[in-house]
Amino acid sequence: MKTFAAYVIIACLSSTALAGSITENTSWNKEFSAEAVNGVFVLCKSSSKSCATNDLARASKEYLPASTFKIPNAIIGLETGVIKNEHQVFKWDGKPRAMKQWERDLTLRGAIQVSAVPVFQQIAREVGEVRMQKYLKKFSYGSQNISGGIDKFWLEDQLRISAVNQVEFLESLYLNKLSASKENQLIVKEALVTEAAPEYLVHSKTGFSGVGTESNPGVAWWVGWVEKETEVYFFAFNMDIDNESKLPLRKSIPTKIMESEGIIGG
């Protein structure tokens, strides 16, 4: 098994509390090459405050967060009282939605798990531009640019975030260090649990901006963290996507890398 000490190219990340440096592990690129995918994976180990990536340049490049933005959106909704608590039910109005799994009443956890865009668009509209902007600044979340529409700025407009910034934000959430109540951070963390194995626990969220074109591809994300014994691993993956058939790769590629590092699986 490779270790973090084996990574060879070092660059300073002065902006992050998680890591004093990030190393480049080009051996991870074989997982991207095997699927003919352009993308980046950032993996950080909490105890050593160290991060690694397959691509230093792309790790700091900003992209639309797409539905990974449901994480801060949920926290902001709770902080502002738009979401009353974790038990609140978001009623379906009976009108057709883009996905059948959205056509039902949903709790906060349910809405996050099925990535119900209409629910979070309504939350954003009720939060409003002024409060949304205030919290994104407090969270140091990406470009903090919400122009283009309060219910779509994270889906198709100006908000951007890098893989490095994603793991910084997730670490702050994990440690309850965001400018938000501990209770509300705990609610959202619980809603993000996507795998509970005997040896580890995964909190995560996917994102997908749409396929785009070959010359102007969309972006697909998987971000989160793994709790294993006394260690925590934060991760962020994004990839270019011009064909929806490639969408499962947003999870399968980082999963293979984390399996090779002995973090999940087996």
Curated annotation (Swiss-Prot):
Enzyme class, spelled out = hydrolase
Q: Positions modified as N6-carboxylysine?
A: 70
Q: What's the protein name?
A: Beta-lactamase OXA-11
- From the UniProt annotation, give the residues forming the signal peptide: 1-20
Q: Enumerate the active-site residues.
A: 67 (acyl-ester intermediate)
What domain of life? Bacteria
Query: Mind telling me which InterPro entries this protein's record contains?
Result: Bact_Transpept/Beta-Lactamase, Beta-lactam/transpept-like, Beta-lactam_class-D_AS, PCN-bd_Tpept
- Assigned EC number: 3.5.2.6
Protein source organism: Pseudomonas aeruginosa
Q: Which GO terms describe its biological process?
A: antibiotic catabolic process; cell wall organization; response to antibiotic
| Gene name of this polypeptide | bla
UniProt GO MF annotations: beta-lactamase activity; penicillin binding
